[in-house]
Amino acid sequence: MVLMIILDNSIQTKSKAYSISKLITINTLGPEGTSSEYAAKNFITNFTLLQGVNSKLSLHDTFESCIEKTLQSPLEYTIVPHAYDGIKHFYMRPDLQLLQIFRCDTPMYGLAVRPGFEYTDDMLDKAVIVSHPSPINLIKYFTRKDVTFDLVNSTSAAAKRVKEGLSDIALTNELARQKYGLHFVKTFKSIPMSWSLFGKGEIHDEN
């Protein structure tokens, strides 16, 4: 795991009126087992706790839901990976502000199946792989296969579908694999990733 602060506007100095004794909330994509949860927990451990800021983690179905929570209170923040295509919209919003950028590499990614499922490589030519949209190019780069995907909201949701028998193969991470009792038939890599921390912005009427 690598966690490095690239840009620091500081949660504490965002508004001098805030007391570090107040509880802040870090919102990100859930459910448990996502790479976003992993990054948020590492951010809390390596930044907010060291800065003396009390914080809790809140997981949501979409990053847009996280942002809606952030817009409701100056004590609500959202962590989003730069691999998420929709992050470009968050940078444009006048009611949000970018507070920090940091690096936190993801857990290992790979193809996971249920225990007892008999996997063979030729399945990639015809099987449908359940995955979050962001990491799907791992299949292309590591297997040279043009596969079909069933897209879901998170890597954890992908693993859950395999556990429940709704899909046979998931592209997921190590945390979700463990959580849902799956095993990897292929491992790819821990993805080097940077993340943005957003807070509620202050809109100034210039008219």
Give the location of each predicted region.
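Domain-level signature for soluble enzymes in the chorismate/prephenate branch of the shikimate pathway
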Residues: 2-207
